[in-house]
């Protein structure tokens, strides 16, 4: 499908694009994602039906734009996406700027993913699935910003259905969004220079994510706030003055858009009382937005795998 040709045709005819290759139909959802009675209740709506002034992007692209949907277990994709938003050089390849709801809107969008050694352009219409008035999949934190929902739909089309996003590998998503090379490190048997590896990867603008063990379908949240069988984005790492020495801390983000670690170095932990106020102000966002800090030791205890991806080895 040629995006420019299809859009020009729709604009000329005064039509909104309807994608016959990934239709607003139950087969695009997949047969086993939901019970049959719920599948029958799915409605498809365009952003222009949901909002008076929809935007593809508002005030730039950020991980905080993303909130994982309540029916789709695609944290592995969204954790990779959260990392992608931090690296604008990769983002520009995936999310072309020649589209939106303001100029030349025809209900058609396109996104690019890396597949088998090449960038593939995936064209979609903008009809999104709803169940009982709620987004079936990812939904925007700002009600009229739609890039997360539309990008996820394009990736679902690439994979054959939304159901095929239900459980997957963070390592695959990182490569599909960058065309890069990824490395997996076991945190149960970590390299002795893990802190240096994290610092170097952060400095080199690598994409980073991590995962916990456990059954991902169950979404079990431990008392300490960490979710089992779940993927997170590593969004930063820093060494700070703490008491009389130095402390290496790591910042992580949960694709749920809420639900955070509540141990040492979490938003309200007493450790921050021993950090210079200027440094604390620069690093700490005391909000339930899914992002939190933790020590390198706790990171190794709580997570099982670290994934690092860059466009060069």
Give short role names for the model-derived ranges:
Residues 1-313:
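Structured alpha-helical subdomains that flank or immediately precede key functional sites
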